[in-house]
């Protein structure tokens, strides 16, 4: 039950993962292009989760459970593994209490723990595509890869996945890079550790040089107070990708909590908050539960990345269990690791305008809705925005308390009640999302005058409609994180690796979106990527699809320029709008909107400081924040093996209170100044402790 120690992936493991992922995706050819990778990733996360449970000995002590079930299914019938093993395992096995499972299933699948949350949950993808037959061959590469992974990471699969999955997600539509461990450690130090030092300074009137010094000099009473404050911190990764940064943050917070608890215990257990008190049988599970539920939040636009991030945090929880029954205590990570567009959505909600929005056309009429303990939809139709926020908080707390009860009693009534309460929460969220997106559409179409290119219409452009806005998958920070903004002024910490490149249509995204059309035209993705212009010249339908796809980015770029959300990253030095917008600059500006005054931010992003077109952003940062470090790095000395030497990256950490004193900029980006992997850690330590 120790903290995860990462292992760099071997080339064999990297290739095995890619082969597994692609084989599952290719087997789902009957699905729409945009959903193939998502469902393949969901199935892959479930296979990894089963492998983690068998490695812990939770599946009847059979460490080869998956492989044995695969072999037995082939003896019964060919191509029956998906329909006869994996689907029943998830939908009638792990997610049902033992007494609810069909007897024939219990006999075939053996003793299984009850896992009410996590990768096995029933999803909309299962409802739509769970009936699609999949051949055994679709799973064979994954089973081979999982065997290799278990051999490489005998202490826990999570140790071998962090860098591998980060590399895979980053490489899907960009450069396949994984953050070097010293760099990730430095970002955690300058955010999580620095925030704890800020709290300690406020408590003791003394600035400690490091958390090591802090833990040596704290009194038990002070440690108990700081432990309470540590449990109140909130950390956001607004572009969480595979979840590696969230896992690193979890491990750092766990380590600090254990250190503070050990000191506080010397005085009296009374000084330790309830969430941090060790249980007799498990000293760390309670810490994990609290931090994963209340401290860590992630968001990503790409659904497969969200599935992988949830998986990685769930695997951490599995490592903190000591027996199968404790799996019921693992939190529902779908409440904290979310899917949506961090850059598009309302950060502040106008109460009066929300209250004036009528119900979405096509939504259920509340008078006709099936009553469940009264009319569940009525509060959103009749009540004010503030009432809706209050109702959401009540439903959220009811659901969390019910899942906690489920962890304690494990009964069928508790399990059914938890499902019911989650449905109530989802209903409320869905209707609020529709009304908030309507407000966003109204702003874009009426106030900003946005129009969408229309390659098939009589005119070059058409009015923006709400379907266009829905397609961007807006995330309304002001609604989903209202409590953090109201009570704390925002998140305490932002820790992230922002998306790279410019805001523009990509070939990878286009091929995935229109995969079915490519198959109808008998054009392979590689053919399009290497011969885009000739293909578009020849085929009218693909040309039209490409124009429609690009048009969605055109209006989105115009929104990002014209809205009042990004004045510093969308303007050039002459005060005019930038010709190109860059994802990472927009994310940086958004992050500071979400960070509380005095909060800390540590991120990786595209280099920008030395570029002339970044002057408005640079000057604003110097005025509004205390920029400690802006560090440009290049790959000329192979910080990231196997990717081009021209690859560059910027590491930045700051505190959200300005102004900046002195110059924070340092560059190791030219061939003659680039850092080798073994030199990176030393340079980072000198930046963190400049007088050391």
Roles of regions detected by a PLM:
Residues 1-254, 298-305, 340-343, 431-522, ...:
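Preference for the N-terminal adenyl/adenosyl cofactor-binding alpha/beta module
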Residues 63-67, 199-228, 255-291, 317-335:
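Flexible phosphate/Mg2+-sensing switch loops adjacent to catalytic phosphate-binding sites
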Residues 175, 348-351, 505-507, 642, ...:
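Short conserved micro-motifs at the rims of enzyme active sites and ligand-binding pockets
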Residues 244-283, 345-402, 430, 444-631, ...:
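SAM-dependent methyltransferase catalytic-core segment centered on the flexible catalytic loop
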Residues 286-299, 329-355:
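P-loop NTPase motor core
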Residues 309:
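Conserved SAM-binding loop
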Residues 629-651:
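Class I S-adenosyl-L-methionine
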Residues 648-660:
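Conserved beta strand-loop-helix elements of the APE1-like EEP
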């Amino acid at each position: 039950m120790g903290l995860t120690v990462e292992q760099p992936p071997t080339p064999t493991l990297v290739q095995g993962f890619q082969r597994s992922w692609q084989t599952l995706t290719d087997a789902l050819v009957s699905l729409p292009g945009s959903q193939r990778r998502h469902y393949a990733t969901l199935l892959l996360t479930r296979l990894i989760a089963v492998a983690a449970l068998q490695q812990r000995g939770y599946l009847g002590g059979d460490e080869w459970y998956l492989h044995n079930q695969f072999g037995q299914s082939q003896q019964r019938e060919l191509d029956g593994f998906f329909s006869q093993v994996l689907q029943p395992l998830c939908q009638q096995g792990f997610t049902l209490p033992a007494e609810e499972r069909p007897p024939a299933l219990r006999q075939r699948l053996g003793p299984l723990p009850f896992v009410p949350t996590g990768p096995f949950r029933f999803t909309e993808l299962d409802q739509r595509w769970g009936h699609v037959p999949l051949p055994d061959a679709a799973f064979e590469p994954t089973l081979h890869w999982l065997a290799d992974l278990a051999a490489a990471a005998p202490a826990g699969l999570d140790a071998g996945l962090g860098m591998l999955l980060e590399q895979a997600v980053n490489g899907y539509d960009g450069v396949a890079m994984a953050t070097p461990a010293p760099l990730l450690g430095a970002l955690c130090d300058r955010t999580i550790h620095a925030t704890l030092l800020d709290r300690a300074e406020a408590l003791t009137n003394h600035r400690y040089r490091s958390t090591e010094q802090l833990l040596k000099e704290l009194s038990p009473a002070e440690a108990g107070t700081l432990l309470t404050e540590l449990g109140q911190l909130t950390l956001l990764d607004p572009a969480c990708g595979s979840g590696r940064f969230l896992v690193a943050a979890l491990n750092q917070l766990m380590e600090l909590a254990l250190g503070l608890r050990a000191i506080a215990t010397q005085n009296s257990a009374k000084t330790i908050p309830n969430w941090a008190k060790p249980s007799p049988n498990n000293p760390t599970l309670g810490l994990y539960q609290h931090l994963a539920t209340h401290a860590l939040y992630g968001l990503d636009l790409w659904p497969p990345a969200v599935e992988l991030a949830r998986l990685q945090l769930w695997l951490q929880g599995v490592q903190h269990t000591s027996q199968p029954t404790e799996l019921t205590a693992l939190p529902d990570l779908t409440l904290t690791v979310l899917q949506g567009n961090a850059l598009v959505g309302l950060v502040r909600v106008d109460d009066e305008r929300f209250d004036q929005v009528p119900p979405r056309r096509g939504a259920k009429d509340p008078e006709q809705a099936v009553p469940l303990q009264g009319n569940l939809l009525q509060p959103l139709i009749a009540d004010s925005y503030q009432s809706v926020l209050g109702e959401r908080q009540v439903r959220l707390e009811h659901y969390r308390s019910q899942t906690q009860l489920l962890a304690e009693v494990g009964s069928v009534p508790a399990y059914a009640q938890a499902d019911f309460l989650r449905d109530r929460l989802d209903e409320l969220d869905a209707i609020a999302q529709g009304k908030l997106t309507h407000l966003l559409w109204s702003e874009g179409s009426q106030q900003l005058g946005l129009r969408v290119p229309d390659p098939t219409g009589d005119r070059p452009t058409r009015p923006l409609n709400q379907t266009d806005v829905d397609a961007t998958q807006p995330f309304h920070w002001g609604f989903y994180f209202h409590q953090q903004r109201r009570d704390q002024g925002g998140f305490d910490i932002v820790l992230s690796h922002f998306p790279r490149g410019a805001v523009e249509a990509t070939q990878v995204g286009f091929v995935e979106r229109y995969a079915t059309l490519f198959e109808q035209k008998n054009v392979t993705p590689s053919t399009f990527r290497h011969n885009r212009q000739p293909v578009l010249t020849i085929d009218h339908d693909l040309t039209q699809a490409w124009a429609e796809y690009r048009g969605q980015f055109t209006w989105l770029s115009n929104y990002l320029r014209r809205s009042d959300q990004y004045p510093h990253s969308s303007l050039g030095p002459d005060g005019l709008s930038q010709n190109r917008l860059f994802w990472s600059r927009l994310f940086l500006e958004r992050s500071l909107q979400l960070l509380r005054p005095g909060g800390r931010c540590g991120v990786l992003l595209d280099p920008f400081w030395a570029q002339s077109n970044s002057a408005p952003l640079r000057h604003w940062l110097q005025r509004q924040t205390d920029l400690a470090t802006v560090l440009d790095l290049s790959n000329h000395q192979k910080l990231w093996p196997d990717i081009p030497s021209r690859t560059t990256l910027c590491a930045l950490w700051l505190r959200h209170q300005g102004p900046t004193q002195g110059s924070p900029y340092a560059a190791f980006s030219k061939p003659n100044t680039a850092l080798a992997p073994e030199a990176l850690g030393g340079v980072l330590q000198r930046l963190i402790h400049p007088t050391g």
